[in-house]
Amino acid sequence: MNEKYTVKAVFSDIDGTLLTRDHVVTELTRTEIHKITNNGILFTLASSRSPAGIEPIIRKNTFNCCMIAFGGGLILDEDRKIIYEKGMDIYMAGKVIEYIEKNCADVTWNIFTADTWIVKDRSDQRVQHEEQVVETSAKMGTIKDLKPYACVDKILCMCAPQKLSETEQAVRQAFPNLSVAKSSNTLLEIMQQGVNKAEAVKRLCEIKGIRMEYTMAFGDNYNDLEMLEAVKYGVAMGNAPEAIQKKAAIVTKDHENDGIAYILE
């Protein structure tokens, strides 16, 4: 770890941050992450992905790390034990799905629990693309396929870039008590109120006995902003929107040029 920073915990977003456009971790970045974990620094992947979508990255790169999934709705420790979960109940999730189908044209919904990914149509090209990116498969179904007491960790909306802001505004107005955040120019995350990466980072640090003044985080998008502002050293990637870069404490190189390693080495 760079001697300029006194850090005991490092948190990293995945897509657009840890991974290149080819969805891989570079050798240099992998090496630097191994170095910090070998030196006793807590490393955690903080993503909007499901645990099943995060696990292949951990396995391929032999990371010893915790996992923040669903944009902060679920935390798993190094042994993949759930240590925190905050999601919607079935009734609320059903109301959101009903609203999307009635009011948001050409928007594909996805329902996520800790171990299930349900979609209306697996032949949808947007779903197929997401399956390839996260290396896991969705199941066709409806909200009724879940058990009555299930915890819905996230509803993901997929739409064209030009429809994203419109969809976000509509969902926010219809459900002011839910957390709504863009994770890319085509993806909208809908979660329980109070769910975000920053709150999950704080919760994990509390569990691990680490003070926030010893934390660092890397991110590239709007759903990372609260996390970047919550930690001591918030690092925006060089490929992040200008608005994110302006609010971050540090700006590094982009995800194609080892932005994480540049700060850690």
Where are these regions (language model features)?
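Mg2+-dependent phosphoryl-transfer enzymes with acidic/Ser/Thr/Gly-rich catalytic loops
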Residues: N2-A9, V25-T26, E189-E265
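Asp-based phosphoryl-transfer active-site loop
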Residues: T6-D22
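Active-site phosphate-binding/coordination module
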Residues: V24-R126
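Residue-level signal for inorganic ion chemistry
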Residues: I36, S47, G71, I155, ...
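Short active-site oxyanion
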Residues: G40-T44, F63-C65, D153-K154, E213-Y214, ...
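Short, structured coil segments at secondary-structure junctions
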Residues: N61-F63, G71, A174-P176, A230-V231, ...
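Short hydrophobic/aromatic-enriched beta-strand-loop microsegments
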Residues: N64-F70, S179-A181, G234-G238, T252-K253
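Conserved acidic, metal-coordinating active-site core of Asp-based
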Residues: D106-F218, L225, A230, N239
